[in-house]
Amino acid sequence: MNLDYLDFEQPIAELQAKIDELRRVGTSQEINLTEEVNKLEEKNAQLTRQIFSNLTAQQIVQLARHPLRPYTLDYIQRIFTDFNELHGDRHYSQASAIIGGLARLNGEPVMVIGHQKGRTTQEKIYRNFGMARPEGFRKALRLMKLAERFSIPVITLIDTPGAYPGIGAEERNQSEAIARNLFEMAQLKIPIICTIIGEGCSGGALAIGVGDRTLMLQYAYYSVISPEGCASILWKSAEKAGEAAEALGLTANRLHELGLIDEIIKEPLGGAHRDTDAMAEKLKKHLQANLTNLQAKSANDLLEERYRRWLSYGKD
């Protein structure tokens, strides 16, 4: 099994292996196999389109968790310039599961804040697997308040399996930190654009998810709980995660139908990890378009629309 591909992608992986083998043979034996390679590549693209046209909710969850999927820092490096990371919550610690700092989007200053996971074992431990402790949320709020002081828009990138549930986090009042962010973000007199780039789970996602616009990548998910957590509660078995994923309605298409997100950003064929540069360029265009729209509004209009938007959830 090719570990760069998920279980439902293995037919694609097998065909790609044949393409790679043909290329090796052509190069080593100086044979022109371009026509054969092109035919197989077209066949592989068709197979990929076929598989990805009918994904289940649980398969989308798998894509959102793909180990090669772009993380916040990958997008910061490709979308923004002059990024200057800011550290610490001024209460307890640095909190590396959330990163943030000043940057420029097409020359305009912005405050970028997002969850950051790790790829290697050491990075995963350092970033706490993208699960923020209270100090992470307090750092994020500190940066948002700083942005408000200088009338700088905030852009958040959401990618977390949830807020960290450890004893220390609870002792430092995890629930208060999340609630405080919801309360304060609702009142910030600056544009806020939130984008779910991977996992958007529970209060850990909401703590940097209150904004004027909510964007979502095509194969990200946004939910009150993970499918496995939901299945463990309702069916006492994580094996029912597939059923839970369908019931939760956590996909971009479903959330857009419900009016909980504003835009779905299409991903490259096979997912964002198949062409990170193209995905970043597309996300950049959506961010810029929404930012231009929001910056044309007064602070009072922003707040009024934000209040109406969030108070409308769950009414219909």
Swiss-Prot record:
Name of one Pfam family that matches: ACCA
Entry's Gene Ontology BP terms: fatty acid biosynthetic process; malonyl-CoA biosynthetic process
Statement: the UniProt record of this protein carries the keyword Oxidoreductase: no
UniProt similarity note: Belongs to the AccA family.
Location within or outside the cell: Cytoplasm
Chief location of this protein within or outside the cell: cytoplasm
GO cellular component: acetyl-CoA carboxylase complex
Function, in words: Component of the acetyl coenzyme A carboxylase (ACC) complex. First, biotin carboxylase catalyzes the carboxylation of biotin on its carrier protein (BCCP) and then the CO(2) group is transferred by the carboxyltransferase to acetyl-CoA to form malonyl-CoA.
Name by which UniProt lists this protein: Acetyl-coenzyme A carboxylase carboxyl transferase subunit alpha
Gene Ontology MF terms: acetyl-CoA carboxylase activity; ATP binding; carboxyl- or carbamoyltransferase activity
PANTHER family from the UniProt entry: ACETYL-COENZYME A CARBOXYLASE CARBOXYL TRANSFERASE SUBUNIT ALPHA, ACETYL-COENZYME A CARBOXYLASE CARBOXYL TRANSFERASE SUBUNIT ALPHA, CHLOROPLASTIC
Quaternary structure (record): Acetyl-CoA carboxylase is a heterohexamer composed of biotin carboxyl carrier protein (AccB), biotin carboxylase (AccC) and two subunits each of ACCase subunit alpha (AccA) and ACCase subunit beta (AccD).
Chain ranges of the CoA carboxyltransferase C-terminal domain: 39-293
Top-level taxon of origin: Bacteria
